[in-house]
Amino acid sequence: MRAAGILAGAALAAMAAAGVAQTAPTDRKAIEARFDQHISSADQLAWLKDMSSAPNHVGSPHDKANAEAILARFRQWGWDAHIETFHVLYPTPISTTVEMVAPEKIVLGGQEPPIPGDDTSSRTADALPPYVAFQGDGDVTGDLVYVNYGMPEDYKDLARRGIDVKGKIVIARYGTGWRGLKPKLAQDHGAIGCIIYSDPADDGYAQSDAYPVGGARPAGSVQRGSVADMPLYPGDPLTPGIGATLNAKRLTREEAPTLLKIPVLPMSYGDAGKLLARLGGPVAPAPWRGALPVTYHMGGNGGVSVHLAVKSNWKLTPAYDVIAMLKGARYPDQWVIRGNHHDGWVFGAADPLSGNVAMLSEAKALGELYRSGWRPARTIVYTSWDAEEPMLLGSTEWAEQHADELKQKGAIYINTDGNGRGMLHAQGSHPFQHLVNAVAADVTDPETGASVAARARAGVLADAFDRTGHVNETALAAAEKGGDLPLGALGSGSDYSAYIQHLGLPALNIGFGGEDESDGVYHSIYDSFHHVTTFDDPGLKYGAALSKVVGRLVLRLADADLPVQRYGDFADTVAAYLGEVKKLAADRRAEDAKRDRLTADGAFRLASDPLKPVGAPAPEAMTPEFDFAALDGAVKTLRQSAAAFDGALAARGAALSQAQRDRLSVQLRDIDQLLLDDRGLPERPWYKHLIYAPGRFTGYGAKTLPGVREAIEERRFGDAREFVGRTAKVLRDYAARLDQARATVEGK
């Protein structure tokens, strides 16, 4: 899955001014130069071609073969490595049926057709058919209703037009929110089945030429995926909070709250167009219209009836996590953890293997450094996860199985996933924002010869001038001043989730992209070696660049003699989040008042076309005033403590004794765990982080200050008030730890 944040660089001199670890900078540069000598795009191409040569879904022979090959390479390069096996619930289809039964019978679905020039697209004997994991088996027939993206606002639009999905089958298009929310919301509204299709407006011919002429999604392509309720908890649905070992105590399927109850299947836009072309009912509003050559209707009038059936094998399947370690010389019990998964939905060349082979390049280079006599100060742990695609299974089970040890030893988790051509993107824990920017300034962009940081900054400036997409005002202001661009916040959708949001380790997610066309074949049979090397990253030049970026992060974090964090960046970011939450509350109050006034005045009734009636919005509870004083005070304290610590380290860091440095390293290793609340978030206690979480109705997308923000959005006003206090407490605790660390710097 792809990164979706932004960053740019800053000068090395700024690092020194901030007190960021400058342990023998000449030696560091020499080590990084030696590291770069061992990074080879040719290696990555050879590994990628082999690893993507056959279907490698969880439980497939090639998935296991890839894990064993990765293990052998780690050992060849001098790592202490092993495979840790978990036994995870992984349903696979026994049979799938989707067909229109009225107004005429048309059989739909089936395996994706081969494409000339893409050799692997014809190797389907061992490939699973298009399906989604963790849907509810069933055999249903019902009238079809089009629900746009199938998000909460879409159901409000349907209700205003008098359309009810109860007892019906819905068809939703991919996009806007995470796929698993679409059938979950359909189920919550009484639907008996759900179809999800990829509209060409979002990743097909409306975006680029369709594959194989271009890289966009062709008419027969189907996006697979998981539809379990990941915003409730990721990992094995049967073992929440514990590792899915062979003898683990498991829930029954009926007890597992993340499993759906209704059948769900994905569909190509070639097939979806046949359904939508025959659908009647009201014409869909403009925002609902995609790029198919049909008039988009909402249905609900009994014009189209669909038969949908899924039967699955609900078995436990082995997942093979490859774990490799280089032991630290000074701080062996402080771990810098690096991960990327190796399982795909079919061939998985872009997602995940383009990122995995970049990680393997790093591991090879680090192994060569180790053989030549270099030893990291901290232990480096490299992980190649299995079973990420179904629901972050491999990484989550390992995190849950080793939770106590990880809380005691984990210093940071660095993640990559699919990689492509374009700008560097990053999300993560904001104390590491400056470090990421500094590393980006030291790596050359392979297409332009500029630094990765300079290109990212230029991209922000040019996009803002051209009004291309959403403009991040914070990033724009930073780019205009030549400063650090902000990290994005981490939601979910890749293997960092358990580490930051459940265990409280700081985390980063890094990748290149924006100029590749991997979105067009995402989770399909066409995510292939041919597609990657033709449209996504020819020659894997950006694979090598990713290795150099992440390798530097690992090296600097492993060898840092002084803290690399800038806590002022974190404090400023939290202050900005609080400003957003306050604005959200004020905007909601104003919107509620306007809605109630227009309803009372009959404006919606008078504005509605009598021949195409649209009712007034349903009444909702008025958003009240909130007392944010506790959070205001906590953020003020955090900013003061962060500024004081950063300033003290900049002034005195170089003169600290080794004993002071060791004490600082211990004090700050687990500081991010103070941002957890063991009671967790409302209705989903697995997620414990009170600054970053995946949204309940966004999935992959992050919600910051989630306990407060989501409660306001969902009109759980009592929860909002409670989490003002709970969030304030974790911020005060965090500030107090910074004060203790400053005392160490000052020799107190």
Where are these regions (language model features)?
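Noncatalytic luminal/extracellular "stalk/propeptide" segments of secretory-pathway proteins
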Residues: 23-30, 37, 49-164, 169, ...
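Second-shell loop/turn segments in exported
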Residues: 30-38, 52-61, 130-135, 169-176, ...
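Gram-negative bacterial Sec-dependent N-terminal signal peptides
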Residues: 2-20
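A conserved hydrophobic secondary-structure block that centers on an alpha-helix together
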Residues: 147-214, 329, 333, 345, ...
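Alpha-helical metal-binding/catalytic segments enriched in His/Glu/Asp
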Residues: 200, 322, 338-392, 397, ...
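C-terminal amphipathic alpha-helical interaction region
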Residues: 653-748
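Metal-dependent peptidase/peptidase-like ectodomains
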Residues: 105, 136, 217-283, 331, ...
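Soluble metallo-hydrolase cores and metallopeptidase-like ectodomains found primarily
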Residues: 122-157, 232-350, 364, 368-372
